[in-house]
Curated annotation (Swiss-Prot):
Gene label: rbcL
Name under which the protein is recorded: Ribulose bisphosphate carboxylase large chain
Catalytic activity reported: 2 (2R)-3-phosphoglycerate + 2 H(+) = D-ribulose 1,5-bisphosphate + CO2 + H2O; D-ribulose 1,5-bisphosphate + O2 = 2-phosphoglycolate + (2R)-3-phosphoglycerate + 2 H(+)
Gene Ontology CC terms, in alphabetical order: chloroplast
Species of provenance: Pinus pinaster (Maritime pine)
Description of what induces expression: By water stress.
UniProt main location, coarse: plastid
Superkingdom, taxonomy of origin: Eukaryota
């Protein structure tokens, strides 16, 4: 078994509550899991 901690930055469309956009992104994010950038990696350094 493996535990994975993932962080996503979500920008909801106008009129969409952030928690709904986040839930949709997590669901759909597994299809496009490797959307990663150096900027996002640097932002996650604080969690190490």
């Amino acid at each position: 078994d493996t535990d994975i901690l993932a962080a996503f930055r979500v920008t909801p469309q106008p009129g969409v509550p952030p928690e709904e956009a986040g839930a949709a992104d997590v669901t759909l994010g597994f299809v496009d899991l490797l959307r990663w950038s150096p900027e996002l990696a640097a932002a996650c350094e604080i969690w190490k």
